[in-house]
């Protein structure tokens, strides 16, 4: 916790029955826990940190998630909008800070009407591309009334409903080529990666047929 996310913590307190908030002693632990959650559940992990040094401490765990291709959304606080750019109270250029680790998507919510769209896109991109995304929320924006749905006017961005995961299906030609390669091998070893996720039984069957060892 910190004054950069007081508004978010207040909202989480009100939503305690819907959102499980786990407080840690160090922001780095929060990022590693979010990464671990993603690894063991297959769902998006989320971590929250205050502005300045708090946000910086997330980086180690977020790079672990990015390099292991795990979906994690980092939500960080920032100084009030009128203070940004003035080096006020440990202000850090968070867009630049997170631009590498969350290069697929890092955005600042400057108006409550943005919140639904930005949060939605952060989760969709993290899950679809199995990467890290980051949402930055100035502390004065956190205290404004929520806008449940953006206005229906020019320039407003709306989000969809639901999420359909993409499925990669190899062509018959690719399957036949792989089968031929495996059949011709004398000592076959299988090195599996993220592409074999949710296919444990299939991998076991292939390994049993070929008498192959499996490593990941």
Feature roles, as predicted:
Residues 1-216:
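N-terminal alpha/beta PP-like core and its mobile active-site loop of ThDP/TPP-dependent enzymes
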